[in-house]
């Protein structure tokens, strides 16, 4: 007996998207062309107003580059949720810093502020909340903790395109945010990150 594969997520790709990809392919400029800059501008305007964006090859790379830009590296610790995709912790580890896993709130599956507070050490430099399944992390409490301890906040918004908290876009609360466009995300470009 065979069982057909049931894809966990199948993006909706219509003729408009297919035509847009074909138009770019016909130009021969398939990397860093004008469509990339337009996408960066439109993404910011629509989803995270008042910020800037740089398109990269993946959400993991977006997290990694943000951490490097902030000077995170060996000897530093970044608090991450215990329930997340591997990229969250891996992006910290590849900088040479140490990911410190903090427990989640079992009702929201996002970082527990109490667990974050308990995880802070003298080496802690940042908190990396994950806005999961479109549900924002408790940013008010996390920002208060970050301010009290002089920590940065790096938002992993890979699964929260368009989500808001108190009328404010996720991705606009921290020092930086990263989004993913992997096919299983709620907005895809086949691959990519911002």
Task: Outline where the language-model segments fall.
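Phosphate-binding glycine-rich loop
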Residues: 29-77, 91-95, 100-103, 168
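Solvent-exposed, non-membrane alpha-helical residues enriched in polar/charged side chains
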Residues: 22, 26, 40-44, 64, ...
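Conserved active-site segment immediately N-terminal to the catalytic lysine
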Residues: 155-189
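N-terminal "arm"/small-domain region of PLP-dependent enzymes with the aminotransferase-like
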Residues: 1-29, 34
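Short, conserved catalytic or interaction motifs in soluble domains
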Residues: 58, 104, 132, 183-184
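PLP-dependent aminotransferase-like
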Residues: 68-157, 164
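Glycine-rich phosphate-binding loop of ATP-grasp-fold ATP-dependent ligases
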Residues: 190-194
């Amino acid at each position: 007996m065979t069982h057909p594969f049931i894809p966990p997520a199948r993006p909706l790709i219509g003729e408009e998207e297919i035509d847009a990809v074909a138009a770019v392919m016909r130009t021969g400029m398939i990397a860093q062309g004008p469509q990339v800059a337009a996408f960066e501008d439109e993404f910011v305007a629509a989803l995270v107003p008042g910020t800037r964006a740089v398109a990269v090859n993946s959400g993991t790379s977006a997290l990694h580059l943000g951490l490097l830009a902030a000077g995170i590296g060996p000897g530093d610790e970044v608090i991450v949720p215990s329930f997340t995709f591997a990229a969250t912790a891996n992006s910290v580890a590849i900088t040479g810093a140490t990911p410190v896993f903090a427990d989640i709130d079992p009702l929201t599956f996002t970082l527990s502020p109490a667990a974050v507070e308990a995880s802070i050490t003298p080496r802690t430099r940042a908190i990396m909340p994950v806005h999961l399944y479109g549900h924002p992390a408790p940013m008010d409490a996390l920002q208060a903790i970050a301010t009290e301890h002089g920590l940065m906040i790096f938002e992993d918004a890979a699964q929260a395109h368009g989500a808001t908290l108190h009328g404010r876009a996720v991705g606009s609360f921290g020092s930086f945010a990263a989004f993913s466009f992997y096919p299983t995300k709620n907005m895809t470009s086949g691959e990519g990150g911002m």
